[in-house]
């Protein structure tokens, strides 16, 4: 028997880089907004301890695939003798700043913790996930969140369920290159916000570095600025390369999507405040 689970995308409503730490990482502040847009993962439990990806992500070596890595991390930590066959349907753009790989890893940890009956708590899973990537914990946390530290210090925040037009320019940006780029800016830490109405500064400190590395990001932002009825500043998510704007209605977002140049990928989605990750498989066995 197999079970199917969803892995949601996220956007960063702002991203402020505060300083560089001694360990090479950067302290930051951001809001992770969960989206109703998903990769789809399927898990079949096996005996014998073998973990194998049997479908999807063909361009990624199994040993480098985050879903395989996540499964092995959980297996090694818990000592389970069970294995799993893993399949994935990728919808979230790779290298777009939407957290797809991190979300896939998080879903793998949560799903196999249930399916293997390894009984780890959410905090334990989040700690394991942090070893796989700084964004993995928020997807295990499973709520839109105010984040600090390297993104692992999380507080839930309830945001409006706006519609978003997300554009991927079909080019990837390197997080490592952006964080070492001369155009990376820094922002002073701000007080934690408790509600959306307090969100004033939507600046992304990675934006100018990303545009310096990939000028088409700037072109896409200019295009989104021409869209009718968007309600806030157009923005880049994370370290790019996806950009987005915000709408009150799905109708307005879909109308804007029709005008996106065909050379780019785009989709319309809606904000969600809670991810279905901890309950999804119950209805999808």
From Swiss-Prot:
Organism: Ruthia magnifica subsp. Calyptogena magnifica
Gene3D superfamilies listed in its UniProt record: 3.30.230.10, GHMP kinase, C-terminal domain
UniProt-listed GO biological process terms: isopentenyl diphosphate biosynthetic process, methylerythritol 4-phosphate pathway; terpenoid biosynthetic process
HAMAP family in UniProt: IspE
Name of protein: 4-diphosphocytidyl-2-C-methyl-D-erythritol kinase
Catalytic reaction(s) noted: 4-CDP-2-C-methyl-D-erythritol + ATP = 4-CDP-2-C-methyl-D-erythritol 2-phosphate + ADP + H(+)
Residue numbers annotated as active site: 10, 135
SUPFAM superfamilies xrefs: GHMP Kinase, C-terminal domain, Ribosomal protein S5 domain 2-like
First-level EC class: transferase
């Amino acid at each position: 028997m197999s079970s199917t689970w969803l892995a949601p995308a996220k956007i960063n409503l702002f991203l402020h880089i505060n300083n560089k730490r001694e360990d090479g990482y950067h302290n930051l502040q951001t809001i992770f907004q969960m989206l109703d847009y998903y990769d789809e993962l399927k898990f079949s439990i096996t005996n014998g301890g073998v973990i194998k990806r049997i479908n999807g992500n063909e361009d990624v070596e199994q040993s480098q695939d985050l879903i395989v890595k996540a499964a092995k991390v959980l297996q090694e930590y818990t000592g389970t003798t069970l294995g799993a066959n893993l399949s994935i349907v990728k919808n979230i753009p790779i290298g777009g700043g939407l957290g797809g790989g991190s979300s896939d890893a998080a879903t793998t940890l949560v799903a196999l913790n249930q399916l293997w009956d390894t009984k780890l708590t959410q905090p334990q899973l989040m700690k394991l996930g942090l070893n796989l990537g700084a964004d993995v914990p928020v997807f295990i946390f499973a709520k839109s969140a105010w984040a600090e530290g390297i993104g692992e210090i999380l507080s839930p925040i309830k945001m409006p369920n706006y519609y978003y037009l997300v554009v991927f320019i079909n080019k990837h940006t390197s997080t490592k290159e952006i964080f070492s780029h001369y155009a990376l800016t820094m922002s002073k830490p701000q007080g934690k916000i408790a509600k959306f109405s307090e969100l004033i500064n939507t600046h992304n400190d990675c934006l100018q570095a990303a545009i310096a590395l990939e000028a088409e990001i700037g072109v896409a932002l200019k295009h989104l600025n021409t869209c009718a009825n968007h309600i806030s500043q157009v923005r880049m998510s994370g370290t790019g390369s996806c950009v987005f704007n915000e709408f009150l209605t799905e109708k307005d977002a879909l109308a804007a999507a029709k005008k996106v140049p065909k050379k780019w990928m785009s989709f319309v989605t809606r904000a969600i405040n809670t991810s279905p990750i901890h309950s999804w498989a119950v209805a999808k066995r």
